[in-house]
Amino acid sequence: MKGIFPIDKFRTLQTPFYYYDTKVLRDTLSAINQEVAKYPSYSVHYAVKANANPKVLTIIRESGMGADCVSGGEIRAAVRAGFPANKIVFAGVGKADWEINLGLEYGIFCFNVESIPELEVINELAAAQNKIANVAFRINPDVGAHTHANITTGLAENKFGISMQDMDRVIDVALEMKNVKFIGLHFHIGSQILDMGDFIALCNRVNELQDKLEARRILVEHINVGGGLGIDYGHPNRQSVPDFKSYFATYAGQLKLRPYQTLHFELGRAVVGQCGSLISKVLYVKQGTKKKFAILDAGMTDLIRPALYQAYHKMENITSEEPVEAYDVVGPICESSDVFGKAIDLNKVKRGDLIALRSAGAYGEIMASGYNCRELPKGYTSDELV
């Protein structure tokens, strides 16, 4: 089954472009809010890194979510979209001074700190502004996630976070500082996780750390477990909204949250992944020695995930109902890795057909580049194309 698209409207637009189905997005946000409402101590922050399209951000902000940012630019994008500063968390292993100052000036909720040197800089910059910065420590729990190696973030070998062995020392340093307030612990073990067992392993590790801190009579107000929930790239129509019920219930059942604590989540891909498609036009159909190539006007500069992660995106010829044939679907970029998929079954392709690369709402438009001096793809919502 193919997706439903306003093809007549698409014909009037310059390809390639991103298309966001706002019904899918709003249904996803509604499903999240429905589940979170069961747990009054839960808060969700949208991971802006997944998609910072202003129209998409506005719809997410209207749902009541906070924002999870990893750069000063993302903080600005969130504020422009109307996210309250007191719902913004700022993570990232390499925060520049101007970015920290920006967060302080806006009065964001929390800095997720990844090292003692960073903590010292935040304390110094906060003192210069005569402010106290809320900080949580990103702990690397050494928990492996069943996902692509490039998007694991919770292993000891990864660059992210403070090791469990160093946690006590970092907390001791923070408690001596005058311009930071230690309010919580932060974790994030990876992305595109579909095995709830990975989240259970994280819960077990958080429980261990909580017990360790309580033995020192240190009470933590906030626990932030990051995000990581994946989507079904193979069947975007069958499961357009992820299983948020199981996701939040896993934490409710496994993480021993104290009565005074709040639990924070940072969801990105699961929020926007299924609402977006990259729409591209077929430039040529080329007969090779052993295969056919469908050459698109979209390439790895527009959607880098297949080249970077060997990621799969379901592809559909949305302008043909001819019999199915197999094609290697490639782009125009001068790189051998500019391949969206090999031996892909598509309704017979001809020049001018429109190909939809599905499940491209996350880490698609936001990761586009100008390599080969190409223009960045535009993004349109279904609200605009009625």
Swiss-Prot record:
Pfam families: Orn_Arg_deC_N, Orn_DAP_Arg_deC. This is Diaminopimelate decarboxylase. HAMAP family: LysA. Belongs to the Orn/Lys/Arg decarboxylase class-II family. LysA subfamily. It is an enzyme of class 4 (lyase). Its EC number is 4.1.1.20. Coiled coil: none annotated. It catalyses: meso-2,6-diaminopimelate + H(+) = L-lysine + CO2. Gene3D superfamilies: Alanine racemase, Lyase, Ornithine Decarboxylase, Chain A, domain 1. One of its GO terms (biological process) is lysine biosynthetic process via diaminopimelate. Homodimer. CDD domains: PLPDE_III_DapDC. GO terms for molecular function: diaminopimelate decarboxylase activity; pyridoxal phosphate binding. Its cofactor is pyridoxal 5'-phosphate. Specifically catalyzes the decarboxylation of meso-diaminopimelate (meso-DAP) to L-lysine. It comes from the Bacteria. Keywords: Amino-acid biosynthesis, Decarboxylase, Lyase, Lysine biosynthesis, Pyridoxal phosphate. The modification N6-(pyridoxal phosphate)lysine is found at residue 49. PROSITE patterns: ODR_DC_2_1, ODR_DC_2_2. Substrate binds at residues 269, 305, 309, 335, 363. SUPFAM superfamilies: Alanine racemase C-terminal domain-like, PLP-binding barrel. Pyridoxal 5'-phosphate binds at residues 228, 266-269, 363. Pathway: Amino-acid biosynthesis; L-lysine biosynthesis via DAP pathway; L-lysine from DL-2,6-diaminopimelate: step 1/1.
